[in-house]
Amino acid sequence: IFILSCTASKNTFGKKYEILDIDSLGSKSYVAAIRNIDISEFKEGELKKENISVKYRLFSPEVSSKSQKFPLVLVFHGSGAIGNDNTKQMYALVKNWITPENKEKYPAYILAPQFPIRSSNYHLDPNRNVLASESNEHLDLVLQYIDSLKKQLPIDGSRIYVMGFSMGGSTTMNALSKRPDLFAAGINISGISQFDKMEDLKNIPLWYIHGSLDTDNSPKSNLQFFEEMKGNGKIFFWDCKDKWHNNIASKELIDTIPKWLFKQQKK
């Protein structure tokens, strides 16, 4: 275990890092400012198939040449944003991508679906004695939409990323497990892992983040996944000390996400 401050690199595969938020007051104000960013630049839409539907918002970067291609970032929300107002899912991990600095340094399509029901449900894995997650047809609809977007928009198919918080972190692992061919990397923040497709994920860069004091989603599931995957996969773990479920966001985390994702590319 490595205990590091903000100044050191913390992204070596196979390593677990204890993260100390040394400027918690500054982090809170920084995250609060991002939460207040206007979302009018995101186009509203709705996906429908048979008896299911999923609303979404999509941000498109500024295209300056026909040859330009951009990453796509899929961001899943937690259970507190379940609904159909197409607004509650627009939390800091979505809005961070459209700060003036990030729009310039990390231009990307940002897709933020809002699920009308839980996108992941949990059950006890009897072999591991930890929770495991599983998804439903609403996730399938979103993944099919990405296939459609790839044909319509100048998306770089080697740089499609998926990330999420809480239930969204779980759904991130469900999406990777369903479509390992689609994604270049994934970030699971405070979610619950899926264990039955681990072999398919060993070549996908994974970043796990969890608060050590989290009682909403115990870190046990993600720690178990990390321990099993660290020897032959591409995964590293941020163990955020003295963080619980709903205060996991920090300036360091939010700043590091686009930097790390943009370095990942499918070969």
Positions of PLM-derived features:
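The conserved beta1-alpha1 loop
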Residues: 76-78, 210
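Short, solvent-exposed loop/turn and secondary-structure capping segments
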Residues: 68-70, 84-88, 121-125, 174-175, ...
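Gly/Ser-rich "nucleophile elbow"/oxyanion-hole loop immediately N-terminal to the catalytic nucleophile
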Residues: 65-67, 123-165
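Active-site machinery of serine-nucleophile hydrolases
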Residues: 79-139
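Short, proline-enriched alpha-helix->beta-strand connector loops that line the catalytic pocket
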Residues: 106, 201-206
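Primarily recognizes the serine-hydrolase "nucleophile elbow" in alpha/beta-hydrolase
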Residues: 147-152, 158-202
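A domain-start/cap signature at the N-terminus of enzymes
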Residues: 6-72, 170, 223-226, 233-235, ...
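C-terminal catalytic histidine-bearing segment of alpha/beta-hydrolase fold enzymes
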Residues: 189, 196-197, 205-209, 213-267
